[in-house]
Design a protein with these regions (language model features):
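Mg2+-dependent phosphoryl-transfer enzymes with acidic/Ser/Thr/Gly-rich catalytic loops
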Residues: 62-66, 74-143
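Alpha-helical substrate-recognition element adjacent to the catalytic core
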Residues: 1-73
Length: 143
């Protein structure tokens, strides 16, 4: 089973800090990194998808062991997946293509209203993937 995960707003809280030199800084929850590793150990394939060219995402997330894709247009995702996690309008094509779609509790209204959407308790950047481990552990026999 393959999971497709957005970065900004799912693995981060969507905030961007810019220092006095113009360098971008984003915040990830380290528990999500561990959760991605756990999902891989459970036999799931995890693909992390971002439209951002910020090198910090790849630098941090490559430690998870997941495949990382820099894709501007999520309609052009070329691999098969059954589960998608997204939070904004940019993610709609990815979410609509999945058999099961999930979003953080602070996702945009249009995402929450998509057919078949499962709204998580976690906000973006606050343990979304950790919650997914729990859900998929409970659901696994049914998938």
């Amino acid at each position: 089973m393959t999971i497709c995960v957005d970065v900004d707003g799912v693995l981060t809280d969507g905030k961007i800090w810019v220092n006095h030199q113009g360098e971008i800084i984003k915040s990830f929850n380290n528990k999500d990194l561990g959760a991605i590793k756990e999902l891989l150990a459970m036999g799931f394939q995890v693909h992390i998808v971002t439209a951002s060219s910020w090198p910090g995402s790849e630098f941090y997330l490559k430690r998870s062991g997941a495949e990382i894709h820099n894709i501007r247009n999520k309609e052009s995702i070329s691999f098969d997946y059954q589960i998608a996690i997204g939070d904004s309008a940019w993610d709609i094509p990815m979410l609509q293509r999945a058999k099961y779609c999930f979003c953080p509790s602070d996702a945009s209204k249009e995402i929450k209203e998509l057919d078949g959407m499962h709204i998580l308790e976690s906000k973006g950047g606050q343990g979304v993937m950790l919650e997914m481990v729990r859900i998929l552990t409970e659901w696994n026999p049914k998938l």
